[in-house]
Regions:
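Cyclic-nucleotide recognition modules
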Residues: 26, 69-128
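Cyclic nucleotide-binding regulatory domains
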Residues: 32, 37-98
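Short helix-to-loop capping/linker segments positioned immediately adjacent to catalytic or ligand/cofactor-binding
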Residues: 91-92, 111-117, 136-145, 163-166
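Long, low-complexity, charged/polar intrinsically disordered regions in eukaryotic proteins
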Residues: 122-141
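Phosphate-/nucleic-acid-contacting segments
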Residues: 152, 156-217
Length: 217
């Protein structure tokens, strides 16, 4: 856990001794969740979390049970920071995308820890994390702005290719999660992926995609 926390953006620039003190003041608790396990739900008290292993999805679920995936949280990354800083209940649900170990911190502890060594740096780190997450959410809005399933897939996969520095990309979603993220029907999306492969746009196996150099067809 210490290796993950030492590299986590939330604790960047905070010496180990100060980090240990902050964790105590914030009521740190390590919990394990099975795949599809609920880490927290919409309306729960605010919680600040760091993924230690596995991965989580941040979701919006309406009263009819329709789910939209807003983000994927990988090891070392943070979730719940906006609600913890605002002192508001969770406005989203967070679910384990696979077996995951998570460090949970009390949201209200952010204010209670004021004056604790490293607290000011922690808040600065949270500001940077929030800004970067807003950029990620903005990119999702670009992907879902496309009117066709193909357009949404191309927008998302192109963005991943840029982020990963090559035409071979590994995405953090399975098919259902990708469909939920892009706001499309899974069966229709799978059919469109098959058509895109037939058209020579890409090849894929599970969550690994290779984008061809030309996007014709």
């Amino acid at each position: 856990m210490e290796k993950i926390l030492a590299k986590a953006p939330l604790f960047q620039g905070i010496p180990e001794g100060e980090r240990v003190g902050l964790l105590e003041r914030l009521g740190a608790e390590v919990r394990w969740f099975p795949k599809a396990g609920a880490v927290c739900r919409n309306g729960d008290p605010a919680v600040l979390g760091v993924v230690l292993s596995g991965g989580l999805t941040v979701e919006n679920v309406d009263v009819w049970g329709n789910k939209t995936i807003l983000d994927h949280i990988a090891p070392g990354q943070v979730f719940g920071e906006a609600f913890a800083c605002a002192g508001e209940p969770m406005g989203v649900s967070v679910t384990a995308a696979e077996e995951s170990e998570v460090l949970l911190l009390r949201g209200e502890g952010l204010l209670e820890a004021r004056g604790c060594p490293g607290h000011e740096r922690l808040l600065r780190n949270l500001l940077v994390i929030s800004a970067r997450k807003n950029l990620r959410l903005s990119r999702r809005s670009f992907h879902t702005a496309a009117k066709t399933i193909r357009g949404r897939l191309l927008s998302y996969l192109s963005d991943q290719a840029v982020a990963q520095g090559g035409r071979e990309v590994v995405i953090p979603f399975d098919r259902q999660q990708l469909a939920d993220y892009l706001g499309v029907d899974r069966s229709a999306m799978s059919h469109e992926l098959s058509r895109m492969r037939e058209d020579g746009l890409l090849t894929y196996r599970k969550n690994r995609f290779v984008l061809n150099e030309t996007l014709e067809g």
